Structures are given as structure tokens and as C-alpha cells.
Amino acid sequence: MKIIISLLVFLIFNFGYSQEKTSLSGYVSSEKKGVSDARVFLIGTKYTTQTDSLGNYSIADIAEGNYKVQIVADGFQTLKKNITVKSNENIILDFELSNTENQLNEVVVSGTLKAVKRLESAVPVEVYSPIFFKKNPTASIYEALQNVNGVRPQLNCGVCNTGDIHINGLEGPYTLVLIDGMPIVSSLSTVYGLSGIPNSLVERIEIVKGPASSLYGSEAVGGLINIITKNPTNAPLFSADVFSTSWLETNIDLGVKLNVGKKATALLGLNYFKYNQKIDNDNDGFTDISLSDRISLFQKWTFERKENRLFTIAARGVYEDRFGGDVHWEKKHRGRDEIYGESIYTKRAELIGSYQLPFQEKLMLSFSGNVHFQDSRYGTTSYIANQKIGFLQLTWDKKIGKNDLLTGIATRYNYYDDNTLATSKLGTNNPEKTWLPGIFIQDEITLTEKHKLLLGMRYDYNSFHGSILTPRIAYKWKLDDNNIIRLNAGTGFRVVNLFTEDHAALTGAREIIIANNLKPEQSINANLNYIKKINFDNGTFIGIETSFFHTRFSNKIVSDYDTDPNQIIYDNINGYAISQGISTNIDFNFPNGLKIITGASLLDNKNVENGRKETPFLTEKFTATWSISYKIQAIDLNVDYTGNVYSPMQLPLLSALDPRAPESPWYSLQNIQFTYSGLQHFEFYAGIKNLLNFLPKQNNPFLIARTNDPFDKNVTYDTNGQVLATPENPYGLTFDTTYVYGPNQGIRSFFGLRYTLK
């Protein structure tokens, strides 16, 4: 009997032992940092878990068998790995994740001046990494922004191709451009603030659509673009990115990291762009796009200090020689009336820095300064401008219970001088010198785990216009981990400088009339934002973000092109202006590596005066963007298909006889790129831009009016100053460069390579 009992115990023990289950554990990281809240699961089973705050995970009691482990985390590429589970085996499996352009968990600073996860911020901030911009390589960030929903680079001149950035249909001057959070990009230099920074040195770009005046001052009326440069500590030892197009546009980006002693790290960047081909495919005798010779040097230092306190300082210098005009123009014709040309020399220097004061409290001193010199000739019209801006700010960051406080004092000095009437008084030179001291306070209150309220107030004193008060309120409701609602509202105040903001005021093609003493513009804005995250069991991720926005302007300054075709009349609107609409972005990440980013904006912009509503020139009502990417793993080839589409825009005509179309057509700019990454440290890429070969001249006899007589020597006027139609001038036109809404560059190929040594 004892033998039978012993045998039964032995059999039961061995049966239980053979059925003993095993475990799977490990560490999920990215760039040597743990990734929290990543989903770890065995596909097709009930075994699933999430990583903790340090990136660790563990799944227990797994039965024997073959499984496929999948890791899914917001903002990172999905990973899969086959495993075989055997009895009585504890498997340790670590994963290293790579970033994707879905950056919902990205840390942002632009919304509140504090480093916070994007999903935790009460202010909606869009984040774009270099991965996003590499899908359609460009020579400047200005051009790259054409792939961002609701953001449109707008050319302002068909000859020299200067432009600005429109956010949600608002003109460029309503957008504040920052570098590392510093407002060093002035109205004279918006385009140059987005040119000359090597893409390899950009950590990310943050975009806030809507009011940000309570933190950044009165210029942030329509939104802001904050270019965050790399921390030298995390930058690669050496990086290079070189590409050229079939138009022989050549761009070179170089970056080098240097360790100086034991406590300092420097990052040196060089950007060089050259295009010197006088191409005239539209046969109007003028260059299709402007020629440019631009070089930019950038250096950033970071210093190691006690208690991990911050100290960074950066400097940048830019020089550009830009030309557009008659293909027969030479340097000797600059400023003369034999052959028309627009020649712009630009010199620019910038200095920015942040220093955390050595106190127990978190006190941050930030400073920036820039000088910008522009020497231009628009035909015989000379425009020579000099602008200097200094900025100093001290902030105190303090948490008290449920209150996360940020308060600060700031002062900004703006010196502006040019050779126009804008800076002359009684026949003598009178440079514009503006002081703008201010104080602000912001309190982000955590009402509950799911509800946050942000209150902000800023007071500035403009030495010309007196007191400026800009309040702000934001509310965030986190319904759950996958659904977030934000409501933001605020006001704005902006002083306009016509000669730095409106290129048409400089060309000399039309006479400038300022009807009255222009008052500063004021605005009030509201924005409702909703984020939805959808995670599927198979690893598919869908992110949806929708915003409703409304801005109402008073004292808006409008340009009247219609009253007199030979004049531009500027005046404050006798009424109000509205900018409103809806914008949606949708991200798709599929387990097979397919990624789709798409967005669309429906815009309604109107000037309301004396009960009459008018849509401003060059303002689209609908725009959409997309990016489709797929990597063929077997051959290390990545395919990127990007594009955008714009609805018709009203365009300025010179007269009733003007044969050009009063509206632009629906048009789309589409691109494709192939990137090979099979060699260590190297990437080779090639593709085609403007696949549909769209050109704005399509269905138009010409774009630039009277290129055969740019100095209007053969124009005949009546006694009232109106242009007469003559056999030589059958449409009664004068020389005009303002009829431009898109790039005048057709289909073209490109090829480039990248080298990165970490």
C-alpha cells in the first residue's frame, strides 16, 4: 500500500512539474531611457502587460509554446520578436525602441514655458521631429513647413521669392518665430529665422496655433513656431547631409560635436545653399525662381554645473546674396534702370542663452540679441534697413500644492532704421526705438487628476502705445488615457511696421498710401482641441486631433489693391475681421511598418466693413496635407510619399482688363522619396518633387505683369492718373509682382546622402 501511495505522489509531482509555467520580463528603452506605459503582449493570447515608470515589464505563468511578442508605445515604432517558451524557464528580453513622427508623448515647452509631456499640457502643442521633415528634404525649414497641416509658406513676390508663414490663414506677421524659446526673429527677418539652420541640428519644431501672448508677448497673436536645437550632449559626433536637385540647387548641412574639457560640450553647425541658374521656363524674360548664395554658421555650448543646473549659450551668423529679375541682369545693373533686378544682401547675427541662477529656488535667466542688416535694390528703389533687438527675461518656477506657478519679468528693446519715410521726421533721420518691459504670471492648477486649469496674465508697457494687457485661460479635461479635451482663450496686441512686413510696399511697382494714423491691431481668440488615441490588439495605432478656432480682430490693418491699381492703400478696418475654422490631424501606425499622417483644415477668413464681408487676398478656404511612409525591411528601403492640396484663393488684379485669372485653381504639390539605409552610418536618398508638374502660370498668359517694361517707361496715364490701354499696353497694366500664390518651379529630381557618426 505504501508503495502505491508513494507512486501516486511521485506521478502527481511530476505532472505538476511538467505543467509548471514560465515568465517573461525585461526592459523597454529608447536612447538609454526607460519607456513607460508601453504595451507588451503576446499576439493572439490573453498575455499582456504595461511597462512601469522605469520601463520594466513582467508577464508570469506563460504556458509552453511559440509566441510573437509585440511592443506598442505612443511615439515609437512597433517592435515584434518571435520567442519559444519552454518549461521552467524565465526569459529576459529587452527592447530598444526608435522614435516615430507620432509624438504624442513628446516633451514640449512652448505651451507653458515648462517642460511637460504633450498630453499633459493644458495648451495644445504640435511637435514635428527631423524624421518628419526628412520625408521631403528641403534647403530650409521655411520650405519644409509646407507639409504641416494648417501652416502654409506664402511667397510674397514673384521676383525675389521672399515670403512668410501663414498659420490657419493668418498673414505671416501674426506668427512669432522663436529659436530655443527666444524671440530673436524679428518682422524684418522671419524668412531668415527659418533658413540657415542645419536640419541635423534641429531636435524638434513645436507649433502653437492660437494665442500665446501672455507668455511670449504681443507678437504671438496667431501662433508661434519654436525651433528647438539639439542639446550638444546628445548630438552625434559628426553629421553630414548633402543633396542637389536637377535644377542644380545644392544644400550642405554639417554638424560636429566637441568636448571641451570635462564640463563643456560644443555643437558646431554649417549650412551652405547655392543656386545660380537663371532658368526661364515660362518665357517672360525673368527668372522663374530667385538665385541665392547663403551661408550660415551655428554654434551651441552647454556647460555641466552643480545640481544639474542649466547653462547654454548659442550664436548664429547668416549671410545671403539673393537675386531675381531679368535673366540678362548683372551686378553692374544693381539699382539702375537699364535692366530690372531685385538684389538683396543680408547680414545677420544672433546670440541666445539660458542660465539657471545658483539658488535653491528655480530661477532662470534667459537672454537673446540680434542684429539684422539688409541692403536691397528693387529696380531703382533702394531699401536699406538695420534692426537690432535685445531681450532679457527672468522666470521663477515654483510648485505650491496643486498650483504650478511660473512668473517672470522681461524687457525687449527694438531698434529699427531704414531709408524710407517710416524712420524720417521733418526731413531728418529718426530711427524707431521701442522699449517693451513686461511682467507675467501663470498658474496651472491641478483641480483633480483629470482636470487642470491654467490662468495667465501679462502686462507690457510699449514706449509708443502705452499699457498692454494680455490675459489667457486654458482648461484641460482628461476623460481617460485616450481622450483629452482642451479649451484655450486669450487676447493679442500687435504694432504693425508696413515696410518690414509687406514686401509689396518696397518694390516700387505701386505707390504707398497710408490713409490715416494707423492704430495697433487687437484680437481675441478661442480654441477648442480634442485628442483621441486608439490602440488595437494587433498593434495598430490611430491618433486623432481636432481643433476648432475663432479669432476676432479690431483695428486690423488691411491693404487695398482695388481702389487704384497704381496704389496700395493701408488703413485700419472700419469694422472687424474674423479668422475661424476647423483643423484635423490623423496619424496611423500599422504593425507592418506602414505610417500615414494626414490632415485637413477648413478656413473662414473675412474682413467685415460697413456690413460688407470680403475674403482677403491669398487666403485659402481649404487645405490638406499627407505623408505616407513604408519601409521594405528586406532591402532596407524606405518609401515616402508626401503632398498637399489647396483650394482657390482670390488674387490681386490691376484692372478690369487684366487677363489673369481672379482666383487660383485647386492645386497640389506632391513628392516621392526613396531612402536606402543598408550601410552603417550612411543613408542615400533620391526622389522627385512636384510630381504633377504644377505651375502657377497654367491657364494664365503671364504671372508678372509688364516684364517687358518693368520701369513703366512706356505706360500712358490719363489726367486722373489712371493707366490707359494702348496698342503697346492693351490691358492697361503697370509692372506688378504681387500676383503669386505658389512656387514657380515644376517637376524636378533630387539626390542626396546623409552620414551620421554617433
For every predicted segment, state its role.
Residues Y142-P183, E203:
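Extracytoplasmic beta-strand/coil segments of soluble accessory domains associated
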Residues Y27-K33, D37-I43, V72-F76, K86, ...:
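Short, acidic, small-residue-rich periplasmic hinge/interaction motif at the N-terminus
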Residues A60-D61, H166, M182-K209, L297, ...:
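Short acidic/polar hinge/loop motifs at secondary-structure boundaries
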Residues Y275-S296, T302-L363, G369-K388:
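Flexible loop and strand-edge segments within Gram-negative outer membrane beta-barrel domains
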Residues V645-P652, Y676-K758:
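C-terminal beta-signal and adjacent terminal beta-strands/loops
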Residues K263, M364-S376, K478, R486, ...:
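Membrane-embedded beta-barrel scaffold of Gram-negative outer-membrane proteins
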Residues I91-F95, I141-A144, G163-H166, Y192-P198, ...:
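N-terminal periplasmic accessory domains that precede
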Residues T446-K450, G543-R552, N572-L653, R754-T756:
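Gram-negative outer-membrane beta-barrel transporters
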